[in-house]
C-alpha cells in the first residue's frame, strides 16, 4: 500500500473580503444568537462585506491516498474545504469554489461549503479566523491533520483531527476538548489570581 501523502501549499481562491473587525468588543445582553447569549467579548464584530471579488491566496493542507484527497484551510477556521473522491472523480462534500462570507456567524462572517467545526456553539466565533494546525505521521503510513485553538470566550482548548489511512476510502475524525484551568483573558491591565 502507498503511504498517505501530506503537503502544504498556497491555493488561490476567488474571495469576497470582509470589512474591518470592530476594535471595541460589544458587551451585548439579550442578543440571543442560535442558542447563545449573543455575548462576544473579547472579540469584535465584523458587520460589513465587500461586493468585490479578488483572487486571494490561502494556506492549504492536503492529505491524499489512492482513493481520496482532502484540503483543509487553517486560515478559515480549520475547515475541510474540499474532499475529492479520486475513483468517481467528484467532490463528496459540498465544495464552494468561491469564498463569499455572509453575516450569519456570531462575529459576523461565515461561509458555506466543506465541513465546519463548531465549539462552543453553532457557527463558532472563530469560524472565519486562522487556527493552529499540526501534522502527525503514523507508523502504518497514515497521516493526521490536526486543527485547533484555545478559544478565549470560554477557555476551551479544542483540537479536531482527520486521519487518512493507506488503502481506505474514508477519513477518520477525532476530537480533543480541554477546559483550561483558567479563562484566557485578553486585556492589558493587571489581573488577580
Name every feature range the model reports, one short phrase each:
Residues 27-56, 60-64, 112-169:
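Extended, loop-rich substrate-binding clefts of extracytoplasmic carbohydrate-active enzymes
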Residues 2-40, 60-130:
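Acidic-aromatic substrate-binding/catalytic surfaces of carbohydrate-active enzymes
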Amino acid at each position: 500500500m502507498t503511504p498517505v501523502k501530506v503537503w502544504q501549499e498556497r491555493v488561490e481562491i476567488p474571495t469576497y473580503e470582509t470589512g474591518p473587525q470592530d476594535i471595541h468588543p460589544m458587551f451585548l445582553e439579550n442578543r440571543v444568537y442560535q442558542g447563545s447569549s449573543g455575548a462576544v467579548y473579547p472579540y469584535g464584530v465584523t458587520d460589513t462585506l465587500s461586493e468585490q471579488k479578488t483572487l486571494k491566496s490561502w494556506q492549504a493542507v492536503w492529505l491524499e491516498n489512492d482513493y481520496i484527497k482532502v484540503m483543509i484551510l487553517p486560515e478559515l477556521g480549520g475547515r475541510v474545504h474540499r474532499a475529492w473522491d479520486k475513483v468517481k472523480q467528484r467532490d463528496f462534500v459540498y465544495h464552494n469554489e468561491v469564498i463569499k462570507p455572509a453575516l450569519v456567524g456570531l462575529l459576523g462572517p461565515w461561509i458555506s461549503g466543506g465541513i465546519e467545526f463548531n465549539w462552543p456553539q453553532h457557527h463558532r466565533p472563530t469560524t472565519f479566523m486562522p487556527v493552529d494546525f499540526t501534522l502527525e505521521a503514523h507508523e502504518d503510513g497514515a497521516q493526521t491533520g490536526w486543527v485547533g485553538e484555545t478559544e478565549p470566550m470560554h477557555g476551551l482548548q479544542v483540537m479536531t483531527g482527520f486521519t487518512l489511512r493507506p488503502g481506505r476510502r474514508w477519513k477518520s475524525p477525532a476530537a480533543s476538548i480541554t477546559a483550561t484551568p483558567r479563562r484566557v483573558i485578553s486585556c492589558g491591565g493587571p489581573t488577580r489570581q
